[in-house]
Amino acid sequence: MNQGLTFWGWLFLAAAWGTILVLTIYCFSRVLLHKKKKGTGPVETGGRAQWATRIGLILAMAGNAIGLGNFLRFPVKAAANGGGAFMIPYFCALLFLGVPLMWVEWSIGRHGGVHGHGTTPGMFSLLWKHPAARYLGALGISLPFIIVVYYTFIESWTLGFSWFSGTGKYFGLDNREAMGQFLKGYQRVENNQFFSSWLPLLVFLAITIFLNYYFLRKGISKGIEVLAKIGMPVLLVFGIVLAVRVLTLGTPASGVSSVGAGMGFMWNPDFSQLGRATVWLVAAGQIFFTLSLGQGIINTYASYLREKDDVTLNGLTTSMTNEFAEVILGGTIAIPVAVAFFGVVETKLIANEGAFNLGFQSLPVIFQKIPMGQIFGAMWFLLLFIAGITSSVALTSPAVAFLEDEFKWKRTKAVNTVFAVMVACTVLVVAFFKFGFLDELDFWAGTFGLVVFATIEIVIFSWIFGVKKGWKDMHLGADMKVPKIFKFILKYVTPVYMLVVLGAWTYQEAIGKFLMKGEEQSRHPYLWGARAMFIGLILVTVLMVWLAWRKKNKQAVSQ
């Protein structure tokens, strides 16, 4: 079990890393060397903001996609579902689901922005001349907003643990059980010797919310783009430094295995896993979530493009940047170092317990056992925080853009209103966290809801608007011609793929989740409360869409 990379392991690692590196270098070389075209058509519609630079746009899009899941969720899923063999369904999903949907969302976003719409209610109504379109599009505002309500809370943990690492607060807790108590005390799940008040949690949560507010209030080019230009290079440098440090650990004196065995555990293929439908489903789900598809965010960010700004090369570059962070960096840090110190058997148990146990309980124990552990621990959690804040700022953007575009509010008023509602909802998440409130929201908004929305989106684009028109729109001003086979993929393969994923998740997960199977009776009121928040925020968004279009119709009649 503690063997290093086998021949097949090396082959899968080389193929995955090589493909991603070649495509990433190709994309960025095309982006950086491409000369800006003149006379690219309409520059603004209704005075909407724009991206100052192309590289800033790509880094912001990549920052939206690169989040906690790249460094925690991916390695756990890959290690548990066939190792190197997992990359076969993973890359199939990237080819047939991820990249096509990325191009679709970039195209829909740019098309909507040219006509003054920065969110999916307006965008869908342009593609489908039916009143239902704008109400279905409301999910592209409500879902990311619901996600950011709890995502910001998790994000604040990473900031707190970066501080605790740098100051050595948890040093001395040399086993996972003690670190688990430390985490629960910080989260206020329990009172213990480590934390006896809410103050530390609330301080780091307040700092996190303020930083999100600051960058959003500054706008597109002066806020979000600046954050991406600073945050993304720092994140990638930190990730590379940590990956190199892990690879040079060898066999730690205090460990029970080696990093080589960890890489073997991560990459040696178990081909028997490929016969399990669940593995293919997990791979599709990972691609779907890692690229932030079905959230309405890519659409909103792309709406700040000009009419003939490229979306094909930009979309592929965004995807490859995310894959570099996930497969090469994320796949090298957490699992290999866990195997080196805990061995394969215990690492499997850690992986089965979930990504957060790996990130917040196991790795802090390891940082205490390596030279300069405080520095590397602080760097790890700061990396997660940067990944988190670039994503949370993006998640909040659709709600702000909707109020700006459809109600003509000033950005300050829109940001203030959105954050007031967000803070009120986050208070409930924090207060009821130990009763499963966050997990319930995460399933319905952050898992199931996104699959539903993306399925609606691909059907509207490929079948109602039509692939022929969509293909033409996608290539307007394109710096890269998409192979024509993707016409077929967009019309048939991707929609069927999405329907299969949606059907499978409904059968395997959603029904049992709805019936609260396995949940303690004492938790039921809180879980229903989370569902009430989920449904309530969607209904409020639908109402806001109705009010916006009623206002538009009245103005049209009066003119």
Region annotations inferred by a language model:
Residues 2, 45-49, 77-81, 111, ...:
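Inter-helical loop and helix-membrane interface segments of multi-pass membrane transporters/permeases
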Residues 33-72, 101-106, 110-138, 306-310, ...:
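Membrane-interface "cap" regions at the ends of multi-pass membrane proteins
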Residues 78-106, 200-201, 450, 530-540:
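Extracellular loop-to-transmembrane helix junctions
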Residues 56-93, 297-299, 305, 314-316, ...:
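Transmembrane helix-boundary motif of multi-pass solute transporters/channels
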Residues 56-57, 61, 137-141, 169-217, ...:
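Transmembrane alpha-helical segments of multi-pass small-molecule transport proteins
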